[in-house]
C-alpha cells in the first residue's frame, strides 16, 4: 500500500527536488546563523530537528514518533516497541570486539536507539552517551526502561569541550558513532575528528559508520556521503598517529537512507 512517506521518499530522489531542498536548507541556515552569530551549520541542524520533534512530527531515527519502516506509516514509540529498535546496528558494533567490562562511548547517541542495547550490554557505569542536543537524549530517557537506567547507571551528556575533556579522563576503551558523520558538513569534519582524538587514549578503538560514495556528495538537505579517501584525509589531518581501516558492514546499506555504507575503524596503539 502506498503511504505518504513512500511518496515523499520517491519525490526526494528526484534530482530537482534534492537540489531545491538543499538550496532551501542553505537559505534557512544562512538566515538562522545571521540571527545566531558564531553558530555552525550543525547547530542549525540541531535546532531544526528539535523544532520538528517539538511539533510532534515523525523522524526516522530521533524522538518519540517515527515510522514503521523506511516508507511506512507513522508510529508512536513506547517502551515496548522502542526496545527492539537499533538491535541489528548494535550487533555490528558488538562484532567489532567490544566487551561488557570496557568503558564504552556512544558518540552521537541521539535518542538511544542503538545506545539502549549498549547500556544493556555494558557493565554498570560503563556506558557514556554523548550528543549535541540534550533534548534528543531526554526523549531517549523517556523511552528506555527506567529499571535498566537504574540498574546500569549510564552517563548521558550534551557535548561541550569541557565534557570531551572529562570523557578523555575517563579513558574509554571503545567508541562508536552510528549515523552521525553523515550529518556533519565537510568543513566541520576537523571538529568531529578533533573531539574523537581527544577522547581516545592508548588502546582505544573507534568505529564510525558512514554513507559511502566515490567522492563527497550531499545526498539530502542535511546529509552527506563521503569517500574513504576523504575521511582518511580528514582524520589523519587531525591525528597522523591513528591506524585506520575501512570495512563493509553486514547488510551493506544504510537502514535509514538505503545508501551504501561502510565503517571506519580508528585505533591507537
Model regions: which residues?
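Class I (Rossmann-like) S-adenosyl-L-methionine-dependent methyltransferase catalytic domain
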Residues: 2-96, 100, 107, 111-167, ...
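A conserved beta-strand element that flanks and buttresses the S-adenosyl-L-methionine
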Residues: 176
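Short catalytic micro-motifs in class I SAM-dependent methyltransferases
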Residues: 179-180
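Conserved acidic residues
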Residues: 173
Amino acid at each position: 500500500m502506498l503511504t505518504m512517506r513512500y511518496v515523499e521518499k520517491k519525490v526526494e530522489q528526484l534530482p530537482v527536488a534534492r537540489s531545491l531542498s538543499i538550496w532551501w536548507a542553505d537559505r534557512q541556515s544562512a538566515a538562522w546563523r545571521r540571527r545566531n552569530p558564531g553558530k555552525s551549520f550543525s547547530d542549525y541542524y540541531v535546532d531544526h530537528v528539535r523544532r520538528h520533534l517539538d511539533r510532534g512530527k515523525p523522524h526516522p531515527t530521533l524522538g518519540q514518533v517515527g515510522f514503521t519502516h523506511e516508507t511506512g506509516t507513522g508510529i508512536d514509540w513506547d517502551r515496548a516497541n522502542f526496545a527492539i529498535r537499533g538491535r541489528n546496528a548494535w550487533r555490528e558494533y558488538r562484532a567489532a570486539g567490544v566487551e561488557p567490562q570496557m568503558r564504552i562511548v556512544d558518540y552521537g547517541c541521539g535518542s538511544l536507539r542503538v545506545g539502549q542495547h549498549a547500556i544493556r550490554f555494558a557493565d554498570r557505569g560503563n556506558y557514556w552517551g554523548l550528543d549535541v542536543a540534550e533534548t534528543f537524549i531526554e526523549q531517549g530517557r523517556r523511552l528506555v526502561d527506567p529499571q535498566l537506567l537504574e540498574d546500569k547507571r549510564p552517563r548521558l551528556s550534551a557535548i561541550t569541550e569541557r565534557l570531551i575533556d572529562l570523557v578523555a579522563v575517563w579513558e574509554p576503551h571503545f567508541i562508536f558513532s552510528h549515523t552521525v558523520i553523515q550529518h556533519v558538513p565537510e568543513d566541520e569534519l576537523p571538529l568531529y575528528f578533533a573531539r574523537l582524538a581527544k577522547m581516545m587514549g592508548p588502546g582505544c578503538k573507534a568505529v564510525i559508520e558512514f554513507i559511502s560514495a566515490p567522492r563527497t556528495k550531499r545526498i539530502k538537505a542535511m546529509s552527506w556521503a563521503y569517500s574513504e579517501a576523504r575521511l582518511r584525509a580528514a582524520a589523519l589531518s587531525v591525528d597522523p598517529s591513528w591506524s585506520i581501516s575501512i570495512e563493509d558492514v553486514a547488510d551493506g546499506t544504510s537502514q535509514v537512507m538505503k545508501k551504501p555504507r561502510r565503517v571506519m575503524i580508528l585505533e591507537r596503539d
